[in-house]
Amino acid sequence: MNKLSEVTGLDKDNRLVAIRYANSVKKEDRTDRMEDYLEVIYELVQEKGYATTVDISSYLNVSSPSVTKMMQKLDETGYLKYEKYRGIKLTNEGTRIARNIRNRHGLLAEFFMIIGVDEETANNDAEGIEHHLHPETMKKLEEFINELKKHN
């Protein structure tokens, strides 16, 4: 048994299976970047009542043409309605996905803060991994946090 196996309790074959699984799972043909766009659009609409390509460009630190290209892709996939110079509106499915991402982010950030991570780092770390956790893992994490809250 090597050191990593001792720490993780996983042998090499199990780690390889996990790597294969992580690289084969598709999130309904969504990329992490698509989810970031949906999340930003949702947050902007919640905050301002609307989202513009300029706002999205600013928040995601990407060019306006990149935003326009992604808006067209998200429109084609049915996550939003986009008409150049007319605005951006999330579809019901786009809203559902954005809320789910927002909830995952909040849950992860809350967990990190419970274990003593400062808020800024907790949010940055949550942003980095919110797209990669299995729904069952998120469910168990939520149950764990709720149990902790009962005892505090």
Where are these regions (language model features)?
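C-terminal regulatory/oligomerization modules of transcriptional regulators
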Residues: M1-D13, E127-N152
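Canonical helix-turn-helix DNA-binding module
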Residues: T53-I88
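Arg/Lys-rich, alpha-helical DNA-contact motif
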Residues: R104-P135
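Residues within the alpha-helical elements of helix-turn-helix
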Residues: Y59, I97, I114
